[in-house]
């Protein structure tokens, strides 16, 4: 005991003093600062952990294939916002002011959703594009992919918002991108369920092709060059079209088999298909699909569903698959041919389903003024030239006499009011400019804005090079009829082909 006491007493005084000082209680200021710092840090860490669990970022960190997929989805966000940034008029308040605004049927009564002016919209889209690049950079620079996944989720929400604000932006590759992004973000076991999403999208693409345009080869046989790099023989083109349908139906089923060479054969067939189809459809679809397919099926050594357990959050993913599949077949339950009426087609991954020729006519009368506007999109003229016209023409009458006849290249005005903007129709893609909803929405907005005495609209369409014409809309007085558009069901004011129409127009 004495030796121990002597040892204790022999310690340096400064050590004993330090021990005493360390046992003194901290001041109130020090206590508050440390508590606040701990609380903020704790909350941030809690949010970070919640986001990690939400997006399963550790899974992406471990698998370079998932990083490539995430990078491709971010790159596509950048491409999308860059394309929209180039012409944002219709996404801003300027679109409504200039009569160049056509929201999706789901939000047709929500004009207030476009609340930013032209400059604000353009700047906002630019920022989203830069955020996509930031996410892409962080994905390969930072150890954690959490920032990239959070930015991908933010960009997907913004894309959906602007996408619905102008249905003329609708394209199958944007539908694909949104589905893939949603599945990638919400799933655990991401690689397996992303492969399932690819398989589902191929099957849904095949469902859209169940029409004479593809089953009988009418789509590509109606084109002057038919299919590139193949002989210009009708039966061969038809066989190739049917072969694509078979591949999209059967190919994903091969991923379930334990036969490795069959899985690899299917994988190789899809890669070759996307490389070839890029010659026809261009960069957008190919840039999305080709890298995703290659990245997703690297190291595809086991059947797709081997060891799969559907539980927890993946029940939600399976629910998304179910909703998507229902959307893909929804148009079959609406009477009429979706190639003509477009009813229900946007709930699925709508593809190139037919070539279209469109003629739209609008008669506008107010007081002693009368306009007849004609819109042609790839319309084969009835004269001897046989040319396909894509133009807009107007005849203006005053007091019953023709006062002017001109090609429409600028908005038509009556005083300060715009009654027709050619950009509303010229900016629509091939799969959109045949949609009766586009012309319905124009007439509805014209009646609301201009309050004319009478508006009459007529819409004629031809599919796949057929010379026979189908009249889809014939409304002599739009204001008096006051039709409504329901995106979920049959709209009676859209006429269906009669018995005198060619069989190709009466499908199914």
Model-derived segments and spans:
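Residues at secondary-structure transition points
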Residues: 8-11, 212
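Intrinsically disordered, low-complexity, repeat-rich regions
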Residues: 1-2, 10
């Amino acid at each position: 005991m004495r030796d121990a006491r002597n040892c204790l007493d022999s310690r340096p005084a400064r050590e004993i003093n330090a021990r005493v000082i360390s046992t003194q209680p901290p001041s109130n200021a020090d206590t508050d600062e440390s508590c606040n710092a701990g609380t903020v840090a704790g909350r941030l860490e809690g949010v970070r952990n919640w986001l990690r669990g939400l997006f399963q970022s550790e899974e992406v960190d471990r698998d370079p294939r998932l990083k490539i997929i995430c990078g491709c989805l971010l790159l596509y966000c950048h491409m999308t916002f860059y394309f929209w940034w180039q012409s944002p008029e219709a996404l801003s308040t300027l679109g409504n002011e200039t009569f160049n605004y056509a929201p999706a049927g789901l939000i047709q009564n929500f004009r207030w959703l476009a609340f930013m002016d032209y400059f604000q919209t353009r700047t906002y889209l630019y920022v989203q594009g830069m955020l996509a690049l930031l996410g892409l950079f962080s994905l390969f620079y930072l150890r954690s992919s959490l920032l990239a996944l959070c930015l991908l989720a933010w960009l997907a929400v913004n894309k959906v918002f602007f996408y619905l604000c102008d249905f003329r932006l609708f394209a199958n590759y944007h539908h694909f991108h949104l589905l893939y992004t949603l599945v990638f973000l919400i799933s655990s076991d991401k690689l397996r369920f992303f492969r399932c999403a690819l398989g589902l999208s191929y099957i849904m693409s095949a469902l859209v092709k169940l029409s004479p345009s593809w089953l009988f080869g009418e789509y590509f046989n109606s084109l002057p060059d038919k299919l590139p790099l193949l002989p210009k023989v009708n039966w061969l083109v038809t066989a190739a079209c049917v072969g694509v349908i078979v591949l999209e139906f059967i190919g994903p089923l091969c991923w379930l088999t334990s036969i490795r060479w069959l899985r690899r054969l299917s994988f190789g067939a899809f890669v070759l298909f996307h490389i070839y189809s890029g010659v026809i459809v261009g960069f957008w679809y190919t840039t999305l699909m080709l890298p995703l397919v290659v990245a997703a099926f690297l190291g595809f050594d086991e059947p797709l569903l081997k060891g799969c357990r559907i539980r927890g959050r993946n029940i939600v993913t399976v629910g998304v698959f179910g909703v998507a599949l229902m959307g893909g077949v929804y148009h079959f339950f609406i009477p009429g041919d979706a190639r003509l009426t477009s009813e229900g087609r946007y709930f699925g991954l709508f593809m190139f389903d037919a070539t279209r020729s469109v003629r739209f006519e609008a008669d506008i009368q107010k007081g002693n003024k009368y306009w007849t506007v004609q819109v042609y999109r790839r319309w084969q003229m009835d004269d001897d030239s046989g040319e396909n016209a894509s133009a807009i023409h107007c005849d203006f009458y005053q007091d019953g006499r023709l006062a002017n006849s001109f090609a429409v290249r600028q908005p038509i005005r009556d005083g300060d009011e715009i009654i027709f903007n050619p950009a509303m129709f010229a900016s629509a893609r091939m799969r959109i400019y045949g949609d009766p909803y586009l012309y319905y929405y124009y007439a509805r907005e014209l009646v609301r804005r201009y309050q004319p005495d009478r508006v009459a609209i007529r819409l004629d369409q031809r599919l796949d090079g057929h010379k026979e014409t189908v009249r889809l809309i014939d409304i002599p007085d739009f204001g008096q009829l006051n039709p409504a558009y329901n995106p979920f069901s049959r709209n009676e004011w859209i006429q269906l082909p009669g018995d005198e129409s060619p069989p190709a127009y009466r499908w199914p």
